[in-house]
């Protein structure tokens, strides 16, 4: 579910019997990873770095997962292109869909997280290439022109780290 309002979350809670504490957590921003074990479901919060297609800036995006034995609910309040792409990929490839859904929602959760981290790894590799390019330009005598690029790279690396590192 993308960008639900209070009524959407209340309806979701009623239909799936989500624990009231998990319902409250879904409605607020959680700044660190979280895992709660309720009687018949898990509540999990993870953050992933997302590259803004327009600006190229990296920011952290939260995804809330409610995991039942045979049902998985994802909730997020900002666009997460990697999640949309994964859903589209599953829709287009029946064999992949069957393998991904498997015998339980845990298997689907595994594949979603794996895909999100795979995309994050590619984004990190892109940043590494930009860092190498900036270093090369500095050693070629283009220090002034490279200063702004380095500033943007530093911001991106800090945001990337913030998205993946548990905060204390």
What are these regions (language model features)?
Residues 1-168:
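Peripheral, non-transmembrane regulatory/ligand-interaction domains of membrane transport proteins
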